[in-house]
């Protein structure tokens, strides 16, 4: 740090006397900065530096701005020497380029772990900050040394010793960590002394440290003892023993019994004291809120067993009542009053009320790519506003939902005056790019097709650090080729108005049934719907292959509000699409009316609108809260030009509740979440298409379907039967986050049903429809036995933006007559993690 400060001071002092001596003194003042360049780079990518300093391009040069840029250069800690220079970029000296000639610090050529035998080198490398290819930094090396030591202590190696050194070699620096592990220490026994009110077995359950057993490692952690002592104290304090304490923890180490491990016996000495009851609370000095309002925050009844934890929670809720309304500088003090004879504990709370606090500054630290305005616009608090705790919490939720940051640490500090506060946001950015490419199987089972296709997708959710989204998606295969482009501006004209555009080109080779000659609305050679529905597949000779070309352009917009109870979003968009099918019309006629009509260039336009209420804590991986959304889509905007006219409604609801959230370590909680979802979709046709379908001349495309992937997991083999006009879909998931924000183990129960509104019968059921009213009634009664397609099973759900996949095994079943009828085989399901917004 001393070297860094000295270098910065020297550069600042020389700026006016040497580095900036050009044609005229101070010619660069007030001139726009056209570029910032770095000379002397060897290992550091220029693009990385361009991203960091691009925000300064176009700004006018000032001495303060120059110092800010120079400070950021030194903060990178990439360079041992920095020489600044101002260079004109035009003969008239109207633009200035800041040129930094630098000498890079050496890069890390390699990292070695020496002496470790019990913990793999790969595990140790994952615990350190320095990586191969990074610029060497001695401070980071020392931090990594301490990180490794803490990791060993967490694994029970209490006597571990770690040293580090940097060896300069050709091409960089090799960092070496030398480790003396020692023997692992495990807890063989835990015992208590002095406990009378509670048994030893009860108190053991309070501790995070456990005895070594068959399914419990029992690793001894020195730093866990203080937390365990506090846990015992809290357990007693919740039950009226307000003076209870753990006087000490004796450790008896056995080094002889087990040659590979040290066995330790922990003995907790407890002083319990007397049990007290709650004697009530007196509040003085309050004027803004009534005494009754404040007393209601403490949910303890006079005469009940004293619960210190509940009282502290109530006292905090009382303080939050002021804090929520902007009174952050109030003084609150509580005094205990004991009646040792009656064994009661009462309190007196003194409130000194002051003026409301206002936000003076919002300070952002740690950003390199993201512009400050992208963060500030998500804040519901602005400089000059009355501070509100709920708005502050909701602002943090908005920032977390952006998924731009791997770490976000907020802080509220006093401002320049008593009634002013500064909000400080310490952030650490993460990658917002999503790049996917690979090979997928397509056309499997089709004669004469090449069963592979290539795909590539690039998506950037924080384009140029401005919070906008851009995406490119391309697919190349023998049966399908597509190109999709998308752009979304999340805050249009500085308001929470979203504006986006999409463009798509697609070519596909598809199959359709040939039209029959029976005039009964069935494909050749089938004579009844029962025969068609029960057929496992169609013979190759009865299928018509055709090519389909689509071109589409769409636009969408949305607006959102932030009331206290939820985030409200209203969205809408239009989609303009032209399609054309290619097939031999002289010798073949398709059974599908849509395919037949689209032999000529056909326009398909649609309009959609949606509204949602989002009360989830985090939109992308919720643990609590709820969501309610409604979307309506109108296909066919021009009555006489377009032939496809339909309306679709989608209603969705979600609910999440946390069942368990137990801190196992400083970085991981054992967490269980229960998630519920229900959805109803309805699609109806109107106009010409509705009348033509009623004549039995064909079938319509785009019906609702149980696809077996996103809807009705595991039912993909029956997708052609499971289509209709009404779709009901429900699921329940038990979620266990294995790595928070990355991957979760889920166990799901899924139920879905499609229904044909016109025929008044469920699709995919075993019963047949009948033309007579009595037969139809009987059919509907029989069909109702197997309406829902159900499934259950385990799976892994990835919540990373770069890897939004679900991997699951599903066992499908129905319930005819209320009796579950399961299948023996399990189906593997690969789907995407789709979050409703």
From Swiss-Prot:
Residues 765-784 have a biased composition (Low complexity). The keyword Metal-binding does not apply. InterPro entries: Bac_surfAg_D15, BamA/TamA_POTRA, D15-like, OM_assembly_BamA, POTRA. Induction: Transcribed at low levels, estimated to be present at about 100 molecules per cell (at protein level). The keyword Signal applies. It is found in: Cell outer membrane. Residues 31-105, 106-182, 185-273, 276-354, 357-430 form the POTRA domain. Residues 22-433, 462-468, 490-499, 544-554, 616-623, 659-667, 737-741, 800-802, 830-837 are periplasmic. The chain crosses the membrane at residues 434-442, 451-461, 469-476, 479-489, 500-520, 531-543, 555-568, 602-615, 624-636, 645-658, 668-682, 725-736, 742-756, 787-799, 803-814, 825-829. Recognized by sera from 42/43 syphilis patients, it shows promise as a diagnostic antigen. In further diagnostic tests for syphilis this protein exhibits a sensitivity of 86% and a specificity of 99%. A fusion with TP0453 (residues 32-287 of TP0453 fused N-terminally to residues 38-450 of TP0326) exhibits a sensitivity of 98% and a specificity of 99%, and exhibits superior accuracy in classifying analytical false-positive samples than a commericially available test, making it a better candiate for diagnosis. One of its GO terms (cellular component) is cell outer membrane. GO terms for biological process: membrane assembly. Residues 761-785 are annotated as: Disordered. Residues 1-21 form the signal peptide. Residues 443-450, 477-478, 521-530, 569-601, 637-644, 683-724, 757-786, 815-824 are extracellular. Belongs to the BamA family. The N-terminus (residues 22-369) partitions into an aqueous phase and is predicted to be periplasmic, while the C-terminus (residues 426-837) partitions into Triton X-114 and has the hallmarks of a beta-stranded protein, suggesting it is membraneous. The outer membrane of T.pallidum has no lipopolysaccharides, few proteins and is a fluid and very fragile bilayer. Its lack of surface antigenicity is thought to contribute to the ability of the pathogen to evade the human immune system. Might be part of the outer membrane protein assembly complex, which is involved in assembly and insertion of beta-barrel proteins into the outer membrane. Part of 2 complexes of about 239 and 164 kDa. This is Putative outer membrane protein assembly factor TP_0326.
């Amino acid at each position: 740090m001393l070297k860094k400060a000295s270098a910065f001071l020297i550069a600042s002092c020389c700026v006016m006397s040497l580095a900036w001596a050009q044609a005229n003194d101070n010619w660069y003042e007030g001139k726009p900065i056209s570029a910032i360049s770095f000379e002397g780079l060897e290992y550091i990518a220029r693009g990385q530096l361009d991203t960091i300093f691009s925000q300064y391009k176009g700004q006018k040069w000032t001495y303060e701005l120059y110092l800010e840029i120079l400070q950021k250069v030194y903060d990178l800690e990439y360079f041992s020497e920095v020489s600044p220079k101002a260079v004109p970029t035009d003969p008239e000296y109207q633009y200035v380029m800041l040129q930094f000639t630098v000498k890079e610090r050496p890069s890390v050529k390699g990292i070695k772990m020496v002496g470790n035998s019990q913990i793999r080198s790969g595990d140790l490398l994952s615990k350190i900050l320095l990586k191969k290819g990074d610029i060497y930094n001695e401070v980071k090396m020392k931090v990594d040394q301490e990180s490794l030591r803490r990791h060993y202590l967490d694994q029970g190696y209490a006597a571990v010793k770690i040293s580090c050194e940097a060896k300069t070699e050709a091409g960089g620096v090799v960092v070496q960590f030398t480790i003396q592990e020692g023997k692992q220490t495990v807890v063989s026994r835990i015992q208590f002394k002095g406990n009378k009110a509670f048994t030893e077995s009860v108190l053991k359950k309070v501790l995070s440290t456990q005895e070594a057993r068959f399914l419990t490692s029992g690793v001894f952690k020195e730093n866990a003892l203080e937390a365990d002592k506090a846990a015992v104290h809290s357990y007693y304090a919740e039950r009226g023993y307000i003076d209870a304490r753990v006087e000490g923890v004796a450790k008896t180490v056995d080094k002889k019994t087990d040659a590979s491990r040290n066995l330790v016996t922990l003995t907790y000495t407890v002083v319990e004291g007397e049990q007290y009851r709650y004697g009530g609370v007196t509040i003085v000095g309050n004027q803004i809120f009534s005494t009754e309002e404040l007393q209601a925050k403490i949910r303890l009844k006079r005469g009940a067993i004293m619960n210190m934890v509940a009282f502290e929670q109530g006292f905090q809720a009382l303080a939050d009542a002021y804090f929520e309304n902007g009174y952050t500088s109030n003084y609150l003090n509580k005094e205990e009053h004991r009646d040792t004879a009656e064994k009661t504990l009462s309190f007196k709370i003194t409130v000194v009320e002051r003026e409301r606090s206002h936000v003076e500054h919002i300070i952002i630290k740690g950003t390199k790519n993201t512009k400050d305005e992208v963060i500030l616009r998500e804040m519901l608090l602005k400089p000059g506003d009355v501070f509100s705790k709920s708005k502050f919490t909701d602002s943090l939720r908005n920032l977390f939902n952006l998924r731009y940051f791997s770490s976000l640490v907020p802080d509220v500090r006093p401002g320049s005056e008593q009634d002013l506060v500064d909000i400080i946001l310490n952030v650490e950015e993460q990658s917002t790019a999503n790049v996917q490419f690979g090979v997928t199987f397509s056309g499997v089972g089709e004669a004469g097709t090449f069963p592979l296709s290539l795909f590539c997708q690039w998506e950037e959710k924080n384009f140029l650090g401005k919070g906008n989204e851009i995406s490119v998606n391309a697919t190349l295969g023998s049966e399908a080729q597509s190109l999709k482009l998308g752009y979304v501006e999340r805050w249009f004209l500085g308001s929470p108005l979203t504006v986006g555009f999409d463009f798509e080109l697609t070519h596909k080779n598809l199959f359709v049934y040939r039209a029959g000659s029976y005039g009964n609305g069935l494909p050749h050679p089938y004579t009844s719907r029962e025969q068609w529905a029960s057929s496992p597949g169609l013979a190759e000779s009865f299928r018509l292959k055709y090519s389909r070309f689509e071109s589409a352009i769409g636009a969408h917009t949305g607006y959102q509000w932030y009331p206290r109870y939820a985030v409200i979003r209203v969205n809408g968009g239009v989609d303009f699409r032209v399609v054309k099918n290619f097939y031999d019309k002289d010798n073949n006629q398709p059974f599908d009316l849509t395919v037949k009509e689209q032999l000529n260039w056909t326009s398909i336009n649609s309009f959609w609108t949606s509204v949602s209420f989002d009360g989830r804590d985090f939109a992308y991986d919720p643990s609590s809260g709820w969501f309610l959304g409604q979307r309506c889509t109108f296909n066919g905007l021009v009555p006489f030009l377009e032939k496809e006219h339909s309306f679709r409604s989608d209603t969705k609801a979600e609910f999440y509740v946390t069942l368990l959230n137990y801190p196992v370590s400083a970085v991981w909680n054992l967490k269980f979440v229960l998630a519920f979802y229900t959805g109803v979709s309805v699609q109806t046709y109107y106009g010409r298409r509705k009348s033509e379908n009623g004549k039995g001349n064909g079938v319509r495309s785009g019906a609702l379907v149980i696809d077996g992937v996103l809807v009705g997991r595991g039912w993909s083999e029956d997708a052609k039967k499971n289509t209709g006009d009404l779709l009901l879909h429900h699921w329940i998931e038990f979620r266990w986050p294995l790595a928070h924000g990355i991957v979760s183990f889920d166990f799901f129960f899924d139920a879905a049903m499609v229904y044909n509104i016109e025929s008044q019968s469920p699709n995919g059921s075993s019963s047949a429809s009948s033309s007579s009213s009595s037969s139809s009634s009987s059919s509907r009664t029989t069909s109702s036995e197997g309406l829902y397609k159900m499934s259950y099973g385990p799976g892994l759900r990835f919540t990373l933006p770069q890897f939004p996949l679900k991997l699951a095994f599903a066992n499908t079943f129905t319930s005819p007559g209320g009796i579950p009828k399961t299948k023996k085989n399990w189906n593997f399901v690969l789907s995407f993690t789709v979050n409703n917004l």
